[in-house]
Amino acid sequence: MQLLSIYSLYYLYKKMEKFVVFGRYCEDAIIKREPFREQHLKRLKNIKDSDILVTLGPTKCTKYLFGIFNANDTNELKDLIEKDIYWEKGIWVNYDIYPWIQAF
């Protein structure tokens, strides 16, 4: 039974689509994010350990965020993003989700 469960999870993971997320930080995000940063990073680590998050971070100018995620659909990813403390506290002010086809 355990083998079937592992196989099922692997199959579901392989069925997940990849998405690119591009968004914008609030003004003075570097300062405003500080009280929430530890909670944010801890959550992201858990999501990454679950193979949902591939990568996420700010652009060098720190005005924008860029990420790659595995998810079943855009609604699932939207829910995931909007449960993040950065979204709840207004550190992330908007975002767009794009289905992505990884060529290699």
Q: Which residue ranges define each predicted feature?
A:
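Conserved, structured core segments of small domains
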Residues: 16-104
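Short, Lys/Arg-enriched N-terminal segments with co-localized hydrophobic residues
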Residues: 3-15
